[in-house]
Amino acid sequence: METYEILRGLREDRDLTQQEMADFLKIGRTMYRRYETGETEIPIRHLKTLCVFYGVSADYLLGLPDNLSRRSKNARA
C-alpha cells in the first residue's frame, strides 16, 4: 500500500474530513488533498505530527514492510 492510501484510510477510519486534518496541520485543504492523492510528498514535520496523532509508526505510515524494520534493527545490533 502507498503512503497516501494509508493516510486516507487512517483519516476515514476516524470519520475525519480533509478540512479537519488540514486545519490540524495548519495547511490548506488543497495541500492536504495532495498528500492523500500522492501528488505531493508529505514533509517530515507533518509525517511526525501525523504519526503521533494516529498513534502509528513512521514505518507503518510509509508502508514499509515489518521485516524491513526488523532487518534494520538487527543490522545495528
What are these regions (language model features)?
Residues M1-E5, S69-R71:
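A detector for short, charged/polar N-terminal pre-domain segments
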Residues E5-F24, T49, A75-R76:
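Short basic helix-loop element that most often maps to the first helix and adjoining turn
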Residues E36, Y54, P65:
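DNA major-groove recognition helix of helix-turn-helix
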Residues L7, M21-A22, Y32-Y35, L61:
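Conserved hydrophobic/aromatic packing and binding residues within compact polymer-binding modules
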Residues R45-Y60:
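DNA major-groove recognition helix of helix-turn-helix/homeodomain DNA-binding modules
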Residues L62-A77:
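Short, charged recognition helix plus adjacent turn
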Residues K26-E41:
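Recognition helix of helix-turn-helix/homeodomain-like DNA-binding domains
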